[in-house]
């Protein structure tokens, strides 16, 4: 008997209950949904007609999750100005380079110290380096920090990470899977990623007058269909040229942010962002096998500590180089500390290449801890800054009059 709709309905009821509980105790919804996903899924018991394994509906739930990432990044793009990002181009390039160098170097060092082979070390370093754009976007929106002075640099670092990821995956997949053209593929990936982003920046500067006319649609029904058609087409096309679909959504949001319809788009997108965003974190939890985590506990805990320290240092250095205050700079590293879907993808590449089986449970546990801990660290960034300020005696600096979370 086909219970597909009932399975999806059951999943939504569980997500709703977890969301209500998180809201009641004024806690981030993200860890609740991830843990909920882990407790059910393929390893959960089947109780009569209530099937908590969600095997039949897994592809639909996973697709809901992918949509969540798109809406989260699209909304984040709507919150920014391309003009400001272009003006911050140098600081973004410098900040992104600093962030990648510090975290990737620490990952390499940790891999060698813990006894992995060269190729396994490259995989482990990749797992540790790439942050979760979906979680970062969700946290920035939830804590109302999109107007903060450091958020433009955070957004830039996320985009810079995508360029690094394209190059990294091309090179490492060539080394592990035996692709002899890995160097050429890496160079092509760089050119495509840079060119694609540049195209959207140009569009955001030149096309708003045309877009204002095209989007001058009175009917909300037709308007939202047009916006969603553009969103999914651009995201899907981005994937075909090996740029993350989430980055495509972010870039489209940046273009629409320059139009006079940006507020209307935001208003209509918010419910979809919240619903599908919740489904992303639930589906992410479903992908984690809780019974495989024990063998990598200490390895993951060490990596978590290293990541938090590395992120904080990288954020401070990048922020200060960009002229931000100590407080804003500390927020950078404490905001992009979460790890997620990209780390799992990197680990799976290593498994596909026949590397150590420990990589998968390590990545799962590492991501789980930081996906839960990351939003908490971001939320408590003010307290963390005050504590560190007592130790390092940073001079208090006055930020521009923007709302800080």
From Swiss-Prot:
The keyword Ion transport applies. InterPro entries: Cation/H_exchanger_TM, Na+/solute_symporter_sf. It is a multi-pass membrane protein. It holds the Pfam family Na_H_Exchanger. The chain crosses the membrane at residues 3-23, 29-49, 60-80, 85-105, 108-128, 153-173, 183-203, 222-242, 268-288, 297-317, 332-352, 357-377. GO terms for cellular component: plasma membrane. Induction: Part of the khtSTU operon. Induced by salt stress at alkaline pH. It comes from the Bacteria. Potassium antiport activity requires the presence of KhtT. Activity is also modulated by KhtS. Has higher activity at alkaline pH. One of its GO terms (molecular function) is antiporter activity. Potassium/proton antiporter that mediates the efflux of potassium ions from the cell. Can also mediate rubidium/proton antiport, but has no permeability for sodium or lithium ions. In the absence of KhtT, does not have antiport activity, but can catalyze potassium efflux. Involved in protection of the cell from methylglyoxal, a toxic by-product of glycolysis, via activation by S-lactoyl-BSH of the antiporter activity, leading to cytoplasmic acidification and methylglyoxal resistance. This is K(+)/H(+) antiporter subunit KhtU. It comes from Bacillus subtilis (strain 168).
